[in-house]
């Protein structure tokens, strides 16, 4: 599934290397902490990228996009639950609009994905943090972390999109447009 990251050089890299090893052994909290580091950016995110890049095995990435209210979350929930029920290890990155007050995700699609959560899929909601294009800037790095941790496929649900929100096409192997 995944190997051992290269030897750490300083304290921050040691923490990241330990998190990567723990996450790769199946610890979901460690995986969530790595995703948080990537989402926050900066040097810790760079250390995560460096540690996980050689471990990524090429998980299938499926982008799920469409207009607001078209059923993206329902489709994502059902697909993740079905994949988990078939013995796969799906992960979901649900990208939501950002709250103008907190900067966090407004809708929290993760809360509505009951079937997938019950079946054992890994689900992470995140905010766009004002980035246009339907995704957050951290999504490619987060996909790499999930891939390195052995999740396959990785489902990326975008915010409700218009004609200019096409970032998912560059991040996914397959794009599903829900109409």
Can you annotate each of these PLM segments?
Residues 15-26, 31-62, 67-70, 75-178:
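Nucleotide-state-sensitive switch-loop elements of NTP-binding domains
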Residues 1-23:
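Long, basic/Gly/Ser/Thr-rich N-terminal segments
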């Amino acid at each position: 599934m995944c190997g051992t990251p290269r030897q750490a050089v300083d304290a921050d890299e040691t923490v990241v290397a330990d998190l990567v090893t723990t996450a790769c052994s199946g610890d979901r909290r460690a995986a969530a902490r790595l995703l948080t580091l990537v989402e926050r950016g900066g040097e810790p995110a760079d250390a995560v990228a460096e540690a996980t890049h050689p471990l990524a095995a090429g998980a299938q990435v499926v982008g799920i996009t469409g207009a607001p209210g078209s059923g993206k979350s329902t489709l994502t929930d059902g697909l993740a639950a079905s994949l988990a029920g078939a013995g796969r290890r799906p992960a979901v990155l649900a990208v939501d609009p950002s709250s103008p007050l907190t900067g966090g995700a407004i809708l929290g699609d993760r809360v509505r994905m009951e079937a997938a959560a019950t079946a054992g899929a890994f689900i992470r909601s995140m905010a766009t943090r004002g980035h246009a294009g339907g995704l957050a800037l951290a999504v490619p790095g987060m996909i790499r972390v999930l891939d390195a941790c052995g999740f396959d496929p990785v489902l990326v649900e975008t915010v409700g999109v218009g004609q200019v929100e096409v970032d998912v096409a560059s991040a996914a192997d397959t794009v599903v447009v829900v109409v």
